[in-house]
């Protein structure tokens, strides 16, 4: 079976690796173009999928768009049986969707129709969802609206971070995709339409959302911290030894206590929220590495959280 793989971030890599490992012929990998990196933006960083594909000698394509006839002709010339799409980052026009003999299949990190869109892992945690999952669906022209081929649910534990959920779903996605490809080869892959009720959208995380609002209930603050960990990272300003610094918050737990929002309630970083309190468990100063609260506080006195 001739496969075109389309993906960009680290999340996509285990699925690409599994497809290669199970003997499928990956004739091309499509990924986002290299991005400027370094302090001056003079270096170009290739995506994790780009790096992995080159390790296996797979031709890599990095178009900025797939809307043009020339790019669509190149894609069609690959004569793919199927395209596998996992966090690619570009919308696929109808000409691309129709080109593979068996269609295009997407690995999506939510229980559709909940959390269609760009940031399903973060949004599920930020909303306080108790479960999510990984789904394989056949793509159509809508945004994550196609019929579902396979799904597996995953519990979201109370302190689970987006990074931990990301890693879990990536592994599950690799297993599901291999099972789906096998069923597709055997012509036994059953498709079920998505429910019409319960549709929500997982908008891309806005930078403004990363700043913690201590006037919100503790549950919401805790969900924001873990939902944005490790990237982009929730943050706040702290008065440390009399100077105000910006600090990233990577882990927290729900606690007990009350006070004006942002009040430091004890010497172990219990912080009052609009309702209840959270204990900050892992913090990261600018230019530093994440530290457990006990180590972060060594020789430091936090008097105010803004």
UniProtKB/Swiss-Prot annotation:
One of its GO terms (molecular function) is methionyl-tRNA formyltransferase activity. One of its GO terms (cellular component) is cytosol. Keywords: Protein biosynthesis, Transferase. Its EC number is 2.1.2.9. It comes from the Bacteria. Pfam families: Formyl_trans_C (PF02911), Formyl_trans_N (PF00551). (6S)-5,6,7,8-tetrahydrofolate binds at residues 110-113. Transmembrane segments: none annotated. It catalyses: L-methionyl-tRNA(fMet) + (6R)-10-formyltetrahydrofolate = N-formyl-L-methionyl-tRNA(fMet) + (6S)-5,6,7,8-tetrahydrofolate + H(+). Belongs to the Fmt family. This is Methionyl-tRNA formyltransferase. It comes from Brucella ovis (strain ATCC 25840 / 63/290 / NCTC 10512).
């Amino acid at each position: 079976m001739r496969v075109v793989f389309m993906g960009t971030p680290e999340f996509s890599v285990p699925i690409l690796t599994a497809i290669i490992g199970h003997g499928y012929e990956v004739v091309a990998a499509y990924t986002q173009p290299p991005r400027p990196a370094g302090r001056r933006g003079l270096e170009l960083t290739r995506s994790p999928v780009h790096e992995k594909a080159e390790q296996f000698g797979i031709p890599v394509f990095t178009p900025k768009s797939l809307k043009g006839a020339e790019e669509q002709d190149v894609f069609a010339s690959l004569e793919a049986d199927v395209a596998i799409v996992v966090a690619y980052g570009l919308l696929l026009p109808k000409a691309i969707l129709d080109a593979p003999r068996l269609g295009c299949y997407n690995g999506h990190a939510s229980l559709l129709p909940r959390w269609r869109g760009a940031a399903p892992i973060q949004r599920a945690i930020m909303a306080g969802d108790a479960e999510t999952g990984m789904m394989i669906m056949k793509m159509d022209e809508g945004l994550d609206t196609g019929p579902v081929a396979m799904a597996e649910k995953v519990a979201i534990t109370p302190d689970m971070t987006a990074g931990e959920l990301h890693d879990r779903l990536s592994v599950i996605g690799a297993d599901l995709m291999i099972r789906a490809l096998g069923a597709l080869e055997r012509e036994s892959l059953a498709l079920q339409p998505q429910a019409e009720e319960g549709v929500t959208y997982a908008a891309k995380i806005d930078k403004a959302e990363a700043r913690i609002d201590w006037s919100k209930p503790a549950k919401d603050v805790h969900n924001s911290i873990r939902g944005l960990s490790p990237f982009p990272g929730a943050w706040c300003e702290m008065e440390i030894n009399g100077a105000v610094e910006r600090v990233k918050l990577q882990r927290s737990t729900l606690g007990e206590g009350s006070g004006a929002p942002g009040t430091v309630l004890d010497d172990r970083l219990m912080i009052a929220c609009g309702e209840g309190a959270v204990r900050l468990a892992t913090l990261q100063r600018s230019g530093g590495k994440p530290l457990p609260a006990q180590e972060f506080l060594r020789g430091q006195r936090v008097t105010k959280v803004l």
